[in-house]
Amino acid sequence: MGLSEAEWQLVLHVWAKVEADLSGHGQEILIRLFKGHPETLEKFDKFKHLKSEAEMKASEDLKKHGHTVLTALGGILKKKGHHEAELKPLAQSHATKHKIPIKYLEFISDAIIHVLHSRHPSDFGADAQAAMTKALELFRKDIAAKYKELGFHG
């Protein structure tokens, strides 16, 4: 399940492009998540009232949350699989406070892949997509293990 150094380099190369606009990427990813899987919106009291894509695009709170999500994910990706310290508090909050099912992390992973491909097609070809998919699967597998330790089977 681990990634090779070459795969991590592909992941981190495209992630550098994401970091140039964390808020914009994050907002677009969350909008794609909420539009594709409206049930996920119910986990966010702050965003439940946002019904249209236009409302979502106008929401500064959504943009800020997108920035927060991608900042955390970037910190995890940069650890190249050695993300225990970063993952623990994230798993704790997502399992016990927010109660986010692993399935929702799959949904956001799909949204991430889609947005990166649409925004950075020349930097996110098949090899980079495969590497990012693998990195996100590793993240989900490890967070699922933490969920289990915490007694959350979401």
UniProtKB/Swiss-Prot annotation:
Belongs to the globin family. This is Myoglobin. The modification Phosphothreonine is found at T68. Nitrite binds at H65. Residues 2-148 form the Globin domain. Its main location: cytoplasm. Heme b binds at H94. The modification Phosphoserine is found at S4. O2 binds at H65. GO terms for molecular function: heme binding; metal ion binding; nitrite reductase activity; oxygen binding; oxygen carrier activity; peroxidase activity. Monomeric heme protein which primary function is to store oxygen and facilitate its diffusion within muscle tissues. Reversibly binds oxygen through a pentacoordinated heme iron and enables its timely and efficient release as needed during periods of heightened demand. Depending on the oxidative conditions of tissues and cells, and in addition to its ability to bind oxygen, it also has a nitrite reductase activity whereby it regulates the production of bioactive nitric oxide. It catalyses: Fe(III)-heme b-[protein] + nitric oxide + H2O = Fe(II)-heme b-[protein] + nitrite + 2 H(+); H2O2 + AH2 = A + 2 H2O. Its EC number is 1.7.-.-, 1.11.1.-. It is found in: Cytoplasm, Sarcoplasm. The lineage of its organism: Eukaryota, Metazoa, Chordata, Craniata, Vertebrata. It comes from the Eukaryota.
